Amino acid sequence: AGGILRGTTRPEDLSCDQLSMTATHRTLGQTGYQPTDPPRVLVQLRADIPYLTRFVLLRQLADTVVSEAFFGINDDLESTATHTLQTTQRIIEILCEEGLSSNALSTLNKAREYHRELGIHDEHFRYAFLVLATSMVFWVQDFTDARCSSEDKLQLGLFFSQMANAAGIFGISSDIDTYQCQLDAYR
């Protein structure tokens, strides 16, 4: 019992604004959202926010990546691909800031390298998901044993599994086996 859940803000305690996702296909037309606008959830990711709250908001960012890749932003492939990668990079930067992954910075640099070398096309999404799934692996490895109760560990495992499956849809099957082995080690 306890774990990271003890003494922290519960997801149900968060305001609707904190839990709002701006970059979903359903919301884009209603809010006038533009690819250059940072997701509003980023504003909430401050160091003084309880750990579980930040975890919930990171999940919002990951959901944003999935939504953008499936539905696009204003039907503009270039803007969608660029913003998807930027959002993914921000997730990894947050992991670095939280000290949750010693490998996150190198992963972020790889994402930027892919962005420079590959240009904008469908393959771009595969690498965005690859980077996201990789960051989830490092994240789970770095704090599971130290911070998480069994219940929390299961929650993280399910989240990572969903991200890995999303990556698989975009054809990263050769990497998913490796990620699945990492996930199985924590079950």
Predicted regions and their residues:
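Mature, function-bearing regions of proteins
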Residues: A1-R187
